[in-house]
Amino acid sequence: MAIDRAQNLQDTFLNHVRKTKTPLTIFLVNGVKLQGIVTWFDNFCLLLRRDGHSQLVYKHAISTIMPGAPIQLFEGGEDAPL
């Protein structure tokens, strides 16, 4: 069940930044920094767009995703996730 919740949170986050076109900084496990906007994603990869070019990034290669602006995924107080 914990895996389902984690996947749901991941999909919720990625869908939110895709819809709002939030700029992201993505760090890969090898230290490479990528920047852009998510235009599409599935269970295994995401499509990152910047300056008219797209990059297909495999999720297993991603270490950290940092949005360029604060985001609010859930309504609620201290106990609400994120």
From Swiss-Prot:
Alphabetized PROSITE patterns for the sequence: SM
GO cellular component: cytosol
Sm domain segment(s): 11-71
CDD domains: Hfq
Disulfide bonds: none
Protein name: RNA-binding protein Hfq
Key words, A-Z: RNA-binding, Stress response
GO terms assigned for molecular function: RNA binding
Transmembrane segments: none
Record-linked InterPro entries: Hfq, LSM_dom_sf, Sm
Family of the protein in this entry: Belongs to the Hfq family.
Any GO BP annotation: regulation of RNA stability
Function: RNA chaperone that binds small regulatory RNA (sRNAs) and mRNAs to facilitate mRNA translational regulation in response to envelope stress, environmental stress and changes in metabolite concentrations. Also binds with high specificity to tRNAs.
Assembly and binders: Homohexamer.
